[in-house]
Swiss-Prot record:
Family: Belongs to the MtrB family.
Protein's recorded name: Transcription attenuation protein MtrB
Top-level taxonomy: Bacteria, Bacillati, Bacillota, Bacilli, Bacillales
Species of provenance: Bacillus pumilus
Purpose of the protein: Required for transcription attenuation control in the Trp operon. This trans-acting factor seems to recognize a 10 bases nucleotide sequence in the Trp leader transcript causing transcription termination. Binds the leader RNA only in presence of L-tryptophan.
Complex formation: Oligomer of 11 identical subunits arranged in doughnut-like structure.
Gene3D superfamilies to which the protein is assigned, alphabetical: TRAP-like
A GO MF term: RNA binding
InterPro entries in the record: MtrB, Trp_RNA-bd_attenuator-like_dom, Trp_RNA-bd_attenuator_dom
Keywords assigned: RNA-binding, Transcription, Transcription regulation
Pfam families: TrpBP (PF02081)
Gene Ontology biological-process entries: DNA-templated transcription termination; regulation of DNA-templated transcription
The keyword RNA-binding belongs to this UniProt entry's keyword annotation: yes
């Protein structure tokens, strides 16, 4: 059986200034519960918990997870 992934960590590194990282809650009402703004080169390590079901990244950033790495892009 697979292990509990509720405590997985995500590393997010801003490529440009103004990257928004937003934590979304679990439950019948999905809400924002935390927001951070990163400048170029800043890194945040986020964790999925019993309260955090999703993390939204807006802007140019590299996102590393246990599943691999992906790069987000800013709107053009």
């Amino acid at each position: 059986m697979s292990e509990n992934k509720a405590s997985d960590f995500v590393v997010i590194k801003a490529i440009d200034n103004g990257v928004n990282v937003i934590g979304l809650t679990r439950g019948s009402d999905t809400r924002f519960h935390h927001s951070e703004k990163l400048d170029k080169g800043e890194v945040i390590i986020a964790q999925f918990t019993e309260h955090t079901s999703a993390i939204k990244v807006r802007g140019d950033a590299v996102i590393q997870t246990s599943f691999g790495e992906i790069q987000s892009e800013a709107k053009k």
